[in-house]
Amino acid sequence: MTHSLRVIFAGTPEFAAAALAAIHEAGFPVPLVLTQPDRPAGRGMKLQASAVKRYALEHGITVAQPPSLRRAGKHPAEAAAALDLLHATPHDVMVVAAYGLLLPQEVLDLPRYGCINIHASLLPRWRGAAPIHRAIEAGDAETGVTLMQMDAGLDTGAMLHDARVAIAPDDTTATLHDKLAAAGATLIVDALVELERAGALAATPQPDDGITYAEKIGKHEAALDWRKPATVLARQVRAFDPFPGGAGTLDGVTLKLWAADAMPARGDAAPGTIVDAGADGVVIACGEGALRVTQLQKPGGKRLPAREFLAGAPLAVGQRFSPPDTAA
């Protein structure tokens, strides 16, 4: 089936690529895709295209990669060229998903139907850069995807559609990301079909109650504070997979801790102390309860199940992980 609604798409990572693919495969014309410039990545730090760019090029869609869209920003010439391209590209609506660049009012005002953002939370909870991570870290039972009519604020626009997604007890950011990407892809296609048919989408202002902000994840957050309850640390480990991972420093060596679950305390060992180390996992005393780590990684190594890790790097009962403020 083909559609007449013309969609400019702006996005960068896999979450956005899933939406672009759904829009394209549903038959909506996509005359232009905006995505971030190629970035160095991997061990060789070679320039790599974004997931959105890869999809667009594979399907013959024109791609633009301005470093900024702000005429008065650090890249005025590139921004002006991109804005000229937007003005010259006939379109009806812009769909934005994890683009990573600020859209100035000039861009928001350009499409006939404005700009629709696909946000990976149930707004107004978890506005901001890392909604998936923060939902798991906070112990939320569910999250979801919200389609929002973009305005000048940070995820403050009126809500158009949403879809709820349960957070499973073993969900990591990686697994939940994929569920939300699929939900967002379905949601945006349904909304575009409705927009094309009806000429408008019902918009509901975000409530003032329940607003929270999902701050960007920093590498420093990987360090586990063993004084916290094990339930909190288990959520942190799941929330920070695949980035930045959980981390603990043992005898001056920082280990990545990739999978863990909370369990009752064993004895009265000080927080950070290993109280058991076997095939079922490495059990570490916490401020409340204990954390059983079942997947570990040493510097330069691979993620390994506890059994395999211990075969090559034995850990002993009584060893103690350093508190994060003294690990350096």
Curated annotation (Swiss-Prot):
E.C. number: 2.1.2.9
Cytoplasm found in the keyword field: no
Catalytic activity: L-methionyl-tRNA(fMet) + (6R)-10-formyltetrahydrofolate = N-formyl-L-methionyl-tRNA(fMet) + (6S)-5,6,7,8-tetrahydrofolate + H(+)
InterPro entries assigned: Fmt, Formyl_trans_C, Formyl_trans_C_sf, Formyl_transf_N, Formyl_transf_N_sf, Formyl_transferase-like_C_sf, GART_AS, Met-tRNA-FMT_C
PROSITE patterns hit by this protein: GART
One Pfam family this sequence matches: Formyl_trans_C
Residues reported in the UniProt entry to bind (6S)-5,6,7,8-tetrahydrofolate: S121, L122, L123, P124
Family according to the record: Belongs to the Fmt family.
Physiological role: Attaches a formyl group to the free amino group of methionyl-tRNA(fMet). The formyl group appears to play a dual role in the initiator identity of N-formylmethionyl-tRNA by promoting its recognition by IF2 and preventing the misappropriation of this tRNA by the elongation apparatus.
Protein name listed in UniProt: Methionyl-tRNA formyltransferase
Organism of origin: Burkholderia thailandensis (strain ATCC 700388 / DSM 13276 / CCUG 48851 / CIP 106301 / E264)
UniProt lineage: Bacteria, Pseudomonadati, Pseudomonadota, Betaproteobacteria, Burkholderiales
